[in-house]
Amino acid sequence: MAAPAAPAAGETGPDARLEAALADVPELARLLEIDPYLKPFAADFQRRYKKFSQVLHDIGENEGGIDKFSRGYESFGIHRCSDGGIYCKEWAPGAEGVFLTGEFSGWNPFSHPYKKLEYGKWELYIPPKQNKSPLIPHGSKLKVVITSKSGEILYRISPWAKYVVRENNNVNYDWIHWAPEDPYKFKHSRPKKPRSLRIYESHVGISSHEGKIASYKHFTSNVLPRIKDLGYNCIQLMAIMEHAYYASFGYQITSFFAASSRYGTPEELKELVDTAHSMGIVVLLDVVHSHASKNSEDGLNMFDGTDSCYFHSGPRGTHDLWDSRLFIYSSWEVLRFLLSNIRWWLEEYCFDGFRFDGVTSMLYHHHGMGQGFSGDYNEYFGLQVDEDALIYLMLANHLAHTLYPDSITIAEDVSGMPALCSPTSQGGGGFDYRLAMAIPDKWIQLLKEFKDEDWNMGNIVYTLTNRRYLEKCVAYAESHDQALVGDKTLAFWLMDAEMYTNMSVLAPFTPVIDRGIQLHKMIRLITHGLGGEGYLNFMGNEFGHPEWLDFPRKGNNESYHYARRQFNLTDDDLLRYKFLNNFDRDMNRLEERCGWLSAPQAYVSEKHEANKTITFERAGLLFIFNFHPSKSYTDYRVGTATPGKFKIVLDSDAAEYGGHQRLDHNTNYFAEAFEHNGRPYSLLVYIPSRVALILQNVDLQN
């Protein structure tokens, strides 16, 4: 038989392309070992990694490295010099002229012109007064004046402004020069990265039970101790980056370097973060780099008089669904701006990482609109992927983890893009975690569409365990999304209007309240135990907060009634909210002791449709759930991997959790060498209806 013909010169087959990709991406072989289905897309990972490496190389060649490049906030904006002068710098490539005005100049718009530099940059030096004090004192108001090429005179806030305020009933924000003589000094070191991440998703403004905007100081004094007591070791702060529209929930950013002044001063936010650190709690910022507000007078939009500057020009620069502007991630100065923003929050405020909002919108040119992701790998590669945005995310993760190796980054991505949470050295996105966004949808679907006796145990387990191998997920039963007006929290789906009338401990349990309290605990525990490598709860949901969240707006007559968290409900000893709060606390504290979130994925030994039971093992614990609305089971056999004596360590039916006390916690359960459900040992337990148990092998513990 004749030998096969050699390939023509320059021709490359699939094997040759794979070899080339493996040669270019340092740890791609490991990624393809983890997920062999990615092999046909090796060239995509090669291209992404080479582009990422090229940008890093170019930054090194032209800027002296990413360390220097990400310090844009040290020169852009306005800064006090050692001689008492003021140095100002802006990037406004479309401007005809740039000027600084403010209280210091009597608002003369043209008295202080900037000098034009290369690449669209402008700078200004303002000498000090004769006594060497700065001409622009701390707390004074400023504006950048732009003269456009069409002759317009535009008043703007610097994109690098550190503090902006809106006074009285003004429509727009004022830029305030923030340079206090005695800035806050951090007293406590950053906690180490938790081995298990238990996140308390928080919004400072709604953290009071009163109908008003709460302050950083209120949150520090009143909410941080609650979070610590509940056993959470991480806070995710929403709506910190300044946003002109309060009802946007912080997702229409106008000033990216300014901490929202609604809640207080920058120094008070620093005190909040520092106090959390003193409690051993890490703090994540909900960072919004997926889009920006359309505001121009107090936002980035049209900063230099053009529709481009920081954003794509034309239709590509607008998000049709969000009505906001979209960054041009391939722009050198946009990269400087966004990477410097990452560094600013890490260094100036000592945040410990980020939850990146709207990642799906960034990753794809279609922004996820009208797309149903089926899991077909072809959906994650090709022309629909915005590789410039993906490269930016790789750079942002690289920067955060280079500066602070214990930094935590979480991606909000509904698409399930493969390798998003793999290291950049593998060609991945570099995130530490992704949000398990299908889980809350599953719980809402079950509560809306199915009777309890029709819940599919296998489908619940599938949803909770359906995650990419070695890509960590943050599981949650509900987040702020489910609390917003128009939706319902789990507690409200379960108990609805009876929450207003039948939550008193002095009244007998109604069937609705009984069902609601028992299922609320079970849903949260099985999500916590089976759903991921991290867990998230939105503030107030731990105790079954009874109302949705609705910020003041025209549609509700600017009311703050629903823009609050009624922590007073769980503090009232005569109300049943305390039971849910107690369970959430003890669930977190048990995880802290046993570490199931940092343990390998659970082994599910039973998902019995007729009995409505689910059992699994994780971190040496035996989790047992009976979702049946009416059937209890005596001497129910449960499989386990180990012999020995087991004890109950968490029981949702306990009195302190609003249960019916049907289990004796002094009972010992002995696992014998009796194979069951694929496990070599098994034990017999009593599992009442609508009860969740965790058993621990005390022999192994000892």
From Swiss-Prot:
Gene Ontology terms: cellular component: cytosol
N-acetylalanine carried by residues: 2
Catalytic activity: Transfers a segment of a (1->4)-alpha-D-glucan chain to a primary hydroxy group in a similar glucan chain
Class of the enzyme per the UniProt entry, highest EC level: transferase
The keyword Transferase is assigned to this record: yes
Subunit structure, as described in the record: Monomer.
Annotated residues for binding of substrate: 62-63, 91-93, 118-121, 333-336
Site feature Transition state stabilizer, where: 481
Similarity comment: family membership: Belongs to the glycosyl hydrolase 13 family. GlgB subfamily.
Name of this protein: 1,4-alpha-glucan-branching enzyme
UniProt cross-references to Pfam families, sorted A to Z: Alpha-amylase, Alpha-amylase_C, CBM_48
Amino-acid positions noted as binding (1,4-alpha-D-glucosyl)n in the UniProt annotation, renumbered to this chain: 107, 143
Role noted for this protein: Glycogen-branching enzyme participates in the glycogen biosynthetic process along with glycogenin and glycogen synthase. Generates alpha-1,6-glucosidic branches from alpha-1,4-linked glucose chains, to increase solubility of the glycogen polymer.
Name of the gene encoding the protein in the UniProt record: Gbe1
Any one GO MF annotation of this record: hydrolase activity, hydrolyzing O-glycosyl compounds
Enzyme nomenclature, EC number: 2.4.1.18
Active site, renumbered: 357, 412
Pathway stated in the Swiss-Prot or TrEMBL entry: Glycan biosynthesis; glycogen biosynthesis
Keywords: Acetylation, Glycogen biosynthesis, Glycogen storage disease, Glycosyltransferase, Phosphoprotein, Transferase
